Amino acid sequence: MNPLNPSSDGIKENLLTLLAQKAYRFGDFSLASGKKSSHYVNCKPVSLSGPGLLSISSLFLKQINESDSGVAGLTLGADPLVSGVVILAAQSGIDLNGLIVRKEAKGHGTGAWLEGPLPPKGSVITVLEDVVTTGGSSLKAVEQLRNQGYLVKQVLAIVDREEGGLDAISKADLELNSLFFLKEIVERANSLQ
């Protein structure tokens, strides 16, 4: 089997196990949203590993519309996701631009919010996200992209914690598509103990 073309179901199952083993923790945590939780998911140990990023990128690429000109996300969590999808797209003969959205405007030079090859205004960009809780990070990226004249219709996330992110993203006239819900990762982690 070609490692770039295994079945989506097999990729997803393997990725779920990786997330349960390397990204999920149980305890007392403060989330970026300010909420407290006993479940914590840090996708970076998976998205910054070769097998993890290849799996995520493959699954994301299958959900990107042919009319999209690029993918983007808020630094730092989306940096490997954007890079992985763009590389895999290029290997598949698909021309996608990768954009990184800064958390604040660059303090020197052009003062840019966006880094990367900027497609023409009006281009459709899909936002990539590691974990969606309230949707705040995704919406910050969407806001900056829309302010620059891009159309954003969809957010792709590795994990949806199901804590209001879907509602917030839907209210911004966006679709949220997640590879997993937090409960799936918790169930897999519990089954591996």
From Swiss-Prot:
Pathway annotation: Pyrimidine metabolism; UMP biosynthesis via de novo pathway; UMP from orotate: step 1/2
One GO MF term: magnesium ion binding
Enzyme class name: transferase
EC number in record: 2.4.2.10
Alphabetized CDD domains for the sequence: PRTases_typeI
InterPro entries listed in its UniProt record: OPRT, Or_phspho_trans_dom, PRibTrfase_dom, PRTase-like
Gene Ontology annotations of biological process type: 'de novo' UMP biosynthetic process; pyrimidine nucleobase biosynthetic process
UniProt binding sites for orotate: 133, 161
UniProt KW keywords: Glycosyltransferase, Magnesium, Pyrimidine biosynthesis, Transferase
Keyword Glycosyltransferase recorded: yes
Family recorded in the similarity comment: Belongs to the purine/pyrimidine phosphoribosyltransferase family. PyrE subfamily.
Job description of the protein: Catalyzes the transfer of a ribosyl phosphate group from 5-phosphoribose 1-diphosphate to orotate, leading to the formation of orotidine monophosphate (OMP).
Cross-referenced HAMAP family: PyrE
UniProt-listed PANTHER family: OROTATE PHOSPHORIBOSYLTRANSFERASE, URIDINE 5'-MONOPHOSPHATE SYNTHASE
Protein name listed in UniProt: Orotate phosphoribosyltransferase
Lineage: Bacteria, Bacillati, Cyanobacteriota, Cyanophyceae, Synechococcales
